Regions:
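Accessory carbohydrate-recognition regions in carbohydrate-active enzymes
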Residues: 21-441, 445-491
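Bacterial Sec-dependent N-terminal signal peptides
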Residues: 1-22
Length: 491
């Protein structure tokens, strides 16, 4: 009998009895999020909790989706924003896909710097022309819900952790009268010239900033709100507007729009916040997200991270990961096998992602605010990828979550202008990526396994209605003729 056969048998036994087993101590030590970050793995090394709404992770370059008006194939390497072979970091953004073959997100990039203020990211070949920094993997740590790296050009140590809806930054600065924290509202993954529809920034006081970013990308109509709180008051702040000159500019010219503004709005903004720091001084940032409102983001922050204890948030996140990973235990003397297995399990528990505020509110496909009554609302359903194995696995080790995911899919059906179950949904949008009809397999599998607290009659009606949608993927022609005369699939 081969080692693989023995391992498979052990895993099968663990599936059958995980509820009775005690947690194996220290399974998080085997998680290596850096796995998959090279070439086309499309994973990210940053901090997130299981199925978290925040994925706080570094970006290593600014590769545009377009080049000379055409698709730039180099962008495909940056689906998750990070490439292991790169030598610079442009900053740390709060939203990422994991393992996808297309991309979006990369919202609200934060970058600490020291010295002369630079608001352009620069290039990989000339990093000192902008705010990016060189880094070395020798000074990088990537673990479950924790990321750490030294920004060599600034002698700043950057640390990240996260709760479900809040990214927690901790930056250790050198002594300087010119310390800055940049908030780049223009940066994004799969970026292009007109992707930003609008951005807004409200400086509430010298420690709190709120705002939003609206984009037109893979999700065509997406608005994400934020609240950003500093542990130390900034002494000055400002921004630079990179938008094209507007025909209509209003009467904002009576105010200073580059410094000491209470609010500013434009398509393309980069803001900065200035500090004086002592050697080894830590500046912390809590960065909360909301699909609903700026107030929702602030409430999420107050609910999940009321204090400033970075280590406590990190420990809570790693405890949550430990609980999830302990649902399957394996027995092997091979460290590599443990790392591969538990990192794969970790990656399996990143998506779908929670998509609602702490008060259960979320924005639906109809652009109205809804309340998830009795379930947790999820998004990021790459169903053509996940119906075969991931959701069947969830029925075994995450039955409550999978049940909630199907309730989220049924809510999607109710709110969809097309009255269809999701094809590939993210950020409260249907992006229509890939062909097929995979929602029904996820629903049917849950029903057959007895994991269906939702209305099976409603689910059946949603499945039938979606299957009979005449204007989707040639279904009308198939219903009329029994075949499709020509394929015109818009994958």
């Amino acid at each position: 009998m081969s080692n693989k056969t023995i391992l498979a048998g052990l895993i099968f036994c663990s599936f059958a009895s995980f509820a009775q087993q005690k947690s194996s101590a220290g399974l998080v030590q085997y998680v290596k999020p850096i796995i998959g970050t090279q070439r086309m793995g499309h994973t990210y090394p940053g901090a997130t909790v299981p199925f978290g709404m925040v994925q706080l992770s570094p970006e290593t370059d600014t590769i545009s989706y377009e080049q000379n008006g055409k698709y730039n194939p180099d962008v495909y390497k940056y689906c998750a924003g990070y490439q292991y072979d790169d030598h610079t970091i442009t900053g740390f953004s709060h939203t990422h896909f994991s393992g996808t073959g297309h991309s979006d997100l990369g919202d609200f990039l934060v970058m600490p710097t020291v010295g002369t203020l630079k608001l352009n990211p620069g290039t990989a070949t000339q990093p000192k022309s902008g705010y990016r920094s060189n880094f070395s993997h020798a000074n990088e740590v990537s673990a479950a819900d924790y990321y750490k790296v030294k920004l060599d050009d600034y002698n700043i140590t950057a640390e990240m952790t996260a709760s479900t809806r809040v990214g927690f930054h901790q930056y250790t600065f050198p002594k300087s009268d010119q310390s800055h924290i940049i908030l780049d509202l223009m940066a994004g993954i799969y970026n292009y010239e007109d992707k930003n529809v609008w951005t807004y920034l409200h400086v509430v006081n010298d420690t709190l900033v709120t705002g939003y970013r609206q984009t037109n990308g893979w999700a065509k109509n997406r608005t994400l709100y934020f609240a950003m709180k500093f542990s130390k008051p900034f002494i000055a702040y400002g921004n630079r507007n990179y938008s094209k000159k507007e025909v209509y500019r209003g009467f904002w010219g009576k105010f200073n729009q580059s410094k000491n503004f209470p609010e500013i709005a434009a398509r393309k903004l980069r803001a900065y916040f200035d500090f004086k720091t002592e050697e080894g001084e830590k500046i912390k940032i809590k960065f909360a997200l909301s699909p609903v409102s700026m107030d929702g983001a602030l409430q999420n922050m107050q609910t999940e991270t009321p204090g400033w204890d970075f280590d406590a948030v990190k420990e809570a996140g790693q405890k949550t990961w430990e609980q999830e990973l302990s649902k399957i235990t394996i027995q092997t003397k091979s460290l590599a096998e443990k790392q591969n297995f538990y990192t794969a399990m970790y990656h399996a528990m990143i998506n779908p992602t929670i998509y609602m505020d702490a008060d259960d509110k979320y924005k639906g496909l109809d652009q109205n605010v809804h309340v998830a009554k009795g379930f947790t609302n999820y998004t990021t359903f790459s169903l053509w990828d996940t119906y075969r194995a991931l959701h069947p696995l969830f029925n075994i080790i995450e039955p409550k979550r999978n049940d909630d995911m199907i309730k989220s899919m049924l809510a999607h059906f109710d709110q969809s202008p097309e009255h269809m179950l999701p094809v590939w949904s993210n950020s409260g949008n249907e992006n229509w990526c890939m062909s097929g009809y995979h929602s029904v397999a996820v629903i049917a599998d849950a029903v057959m396994k007895g994991n269906a607290s939702f209305s099976t009659q409603k689910a059946l009606e949603a499945c039938v209605a979606t299957a009979r949608k005449r204007n989707y993927e040639g279904i009308g022609e198939y219903m009329d003729k029994g075949f499709i005369a020509d394929e015109h699939n818009g994958v």
